Amino acid sequence: MDFLFIFNIPVYLLAISCSGGKKESADAGLELTEDSVVYLLADNVTLEIRAQFPFIDKDGHEYLTFQNQLEPEICVYDLQSGEFVKSIFFDREGANGVGMFGGYHIIGFDEIYLPSLQQSKVFVMEESGKKKREIITEKTDDGIPLLPFGAITFVYRPIYFNNGKMYIPQTINMRLGNKVMEKSPVYVVVDTVKNVLSPFPIKFPPIMSSDDVTKPSLGNELSYSCCLNDKDQFVFSFFFDEDIYVVSLQDGEMKKIKVKSRYIDKPAIKENPPQDFDGAMKASSEIPCYGNLIYDKYRKVYYRFVYLKADLDGEKNYLNIWQYGRKSFSIMILNEDFDVIGETRFPDFTYISTLHYIGKDGLYLSDSHYKNPSFDENKLRFRRFKLVHYNKK
């Protein structure tokens, strides 16, 4: 279930605490603090947020921004206080129209990148809603056709900028024929000055064969997440692959590193998946797999989300469960060398695993899950977790 589907849908872990997870024997863990930030939502904004990014302006002021799923709008809040700052609106049609866009990237309030979900292009917009220019992303310089894409955090793969180049994500491209797995680029490098596009040096790993891609599936088998560290390395996590892939921007060298969770066996793609909507949503929310991989630049660690096998028999709304980050998950902690130094399991139906951000003082994770007893549809709340090294001398 990837982004096109997504956008088409209108601790210290205390064993005695229902708010934390389970403390395990490890070198590091995530400790729940008493700190939280609450963002009050307008009536036309829902908690089914697909794109959410912190942003620091040129004066050093910190904001939390996210896309309104119901309107062509980016909501802007003060990161620390939770106070609403402003909304940035865009036209759907007309000279400055952007149609349907999936996510965004903010360089500054007068330089906002909106990837179109309908065309292979990126709109560069001002805060006023005026269109500055368009970046066409229809094909690479060697003729590979490209797809519209989303720059989102629900499945964490933003637009990245590095040394004057823009890096945009792609999904599996069925237009590439019987070698779709071998030929589909995962990311594409855009030289916006020379207007040259080239594939990034990584393809989809052999999670499925090109033949299997054409068969009935749940739609999330080839989902992946990507983060950029401060060593100019991209790190990829494919949801049905234990391994992560580290690619250097300096020389294109790629390293494959096994990073296994203690809570799940090797992820296995579901055979003969249900084709009815409820059945597919149930299966998607039950199957064990990996999730988002994010980099914490302040503590020089990575967090890899892991979805545990779940039994949802008796539940009623599988779509909601999936949209709110499933039932059970853990977060693996990796050091700079990609060694696993800890893994924290979180309580069921409490946190939204896809709503998170890195702050200077820790990892912020939303507990606005609709099954959480404290749930309020008008409030987006984040709890702060701090990284704890248990065996540090």
What are these language model-derived features?
Residues S25-R50:
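A short helix->beta-strand "capping" segment at the edge of beta-propeller domains
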Residues R50-D59, G102-I107, I152-N163, S217-D230, ...:
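Structural signature of eukaryotic scaffold interfaces centered on beta-propeller domains
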Residues E83-Y113, L117, E138-G150, F346-I352:
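Blade-loop segments of beta-propeller domains
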Residues A95-N96, K260-Q275, D339-G359:
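Conserved blade-ending motifs and adjacent loop-strand segments that build the rim/top face
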Residues M181-N195, E242, L319-D337, N378-N391:
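Beta-propeller blade signature
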Residues S285-L334:
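Loop/turn-rich, solvent-exposed surfaces of beta-rich toroidal or solenoidal domains
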